[in-house]
């Protein structure tokens, strides 16, 4: 696979995972997710990960 294919595959997998977690939250809480905020966590070598905050209505 080339870089673009790998990037597209990763984006699709991440989007599917987020959609699955939103559905689980909706089902388990009976409330809707109103916002998801991603904050980059960086090191000197570059992006390490993200902190995620979810708001539920």
Swiss-Prot record:
<comment type="function">
    <text>Overexpression increases levels of unsaturated fatty acids and suppresses both the temperature-sensitive fabA6 mutation and cold-sensitive secG null mutation.</text>
</comment>
<comment type="similarity">
    <text>Belongs to the gns family.</text>
</comment>
<dbReference type="Pfam" id="PF08178">
    <property type="entry name" value="GnsAB_toxin"/>
</dbReference>
<dbReference type="GO" id="GO:0042803">
    <property type="term" value="F:protein homodimerization activity"/>
</dbReference>
<protein>
    <recommendedName>
        <fullName>Protein GnsA</fullName>
    </recommendedName>
</protein>
<dbReference type="GO" id="GO:0005829">
    <property type="term" value="C:cytosol"/>
</dbReference>
<dbReference type="GO" id="GO:0042802">
    <property type="term" value="F:identical protein binding"/>
</dbReference>
<dbReference type="InterPro" id="IPR012563">
    <property type="entry name" value="Gns"/>
</dbReference>
